[in-house]
Amino acid sequence: MRVLVVGSGGREHALCWALSSSPLCDALFCAPGNPGIEDEAACVNVASDDIDGILKLCKKERIDFVIVGPETPLVAGLVDKLEAQGIAAFGPTAAAAALEGSKAFTKDLCAKYNIPTAKYQRFTDAAAAKDYIRKHKAPIVVKADGLAAGKGVTVAKTTKQALAAVDAAMVAKKFGAAGGEIVVEDCLEGEEVSFFALVDGTRALAFGSAQDHKRVGDGDTGPNTGGMGAYSPAPVLTAELETAVMEKIILPTVHAMRDEGRPFKGVLYAGLMLTRDGPQLIEYNVRFGDPECQVLIPRLKSDLLPALMAARDGELLDLELQWRNEVALCVVMAAKGYPGATTKGSEIRGIDAAAAADSTIKIFHANTKRVGDKLIAAGGRVLNIVARGRSVREAQKRAYAAIDKIDWPQGFCRRDIGWRAIGRRRASAPLPEKTP
């Protein structure tokens, strides 16, 4: 089978790393890929949002199966166009991708089908939104309806912050068309966790949990980012809670999408808040998370490719996945200045020494470039250092030991990835046999 992965980040590197070892994979391509992915796949310089370019690439290379990494081409209908040309693809159609592409759509779906989520109101008028906020007061959450590169959500601690978020989205048009409508919702209290499930249109199969670290600084300080690290599984998500998530959130969503004429196939990524009233949905993403994918994939013992094919083909019923009885932890290294303006072009040394430090270490590239024989940072999030261990603490220790071998003065990372789990007494205990 000839397989194409669409994307260029750490998520796509993790996917290519797993797919390259599949006996079913005869040839592996990535568009556009990165220098790290070149070790696993043939990288082709076609942008992930260049739908016509991807279609031409598939025809030229006789691609049998496409796995779409980022959300933008999914929402734009890449899967629809691939399938229309007879090319099998893993990921939702544009209609089903509305679960991520429109916050308002998802909130309305939850309301219609009694899926637990925060109380909310939709607005297309800034003045009406402000009146609602003044009436309900902070803390309150303001969300741009459409895709905003992970920057469209404001958890406002004060009414002033909430009103400013409305102005940014609807008056200043900070997010363009994505902010033409906003959702204002109650601020849930509890602990956040990410949960993943493969979906085949009618059924869902748990694909693990994770907790990420959005803030740029230690102690969860500073501005939000795309994610500075993650670990899997999330100890806070007990077997009992996982069952509740599947029965009250994931499966009702899958059935709702089927009933709405938008059957969902792909991976469903639920951002959850574990509240006193049980798990509640914060938002859906319709693709693997980044950096969450980088900690899910190293724990998977089963062949990834047939699992993704089963989701696309509507055949999850008989699929069973095997998982390593270990924790995986990822630390993201970013260029200094991130998430603001960053310097590009600095050289990174010591990658090979870091990767060889421990057999559990895997380094997934994100925004790197190769210039001659030098590895160059291209700004933003640059590297993902992943380690496995019997506990979060052990995996954390291994990851930072590897990072300390990397010579990159212009880069930085958080030094406390995993702090939530380590703070729990059971974090250092052996994991139970089944930890999907």
Q: What residues fall within each predicted segment?
A:
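A conserved helix-loop-beta module that forms one wall/lid of the active-site cleft
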Residues: 90-152
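Internal nucleotide-binding/catalytic subdomain
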Residues: 152-293
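Active-site "cap" helix and flanking loop/linker of ATP-utilizing ligase/carboxylase catalytic domains
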Residues: 246-268, 285-358, 371
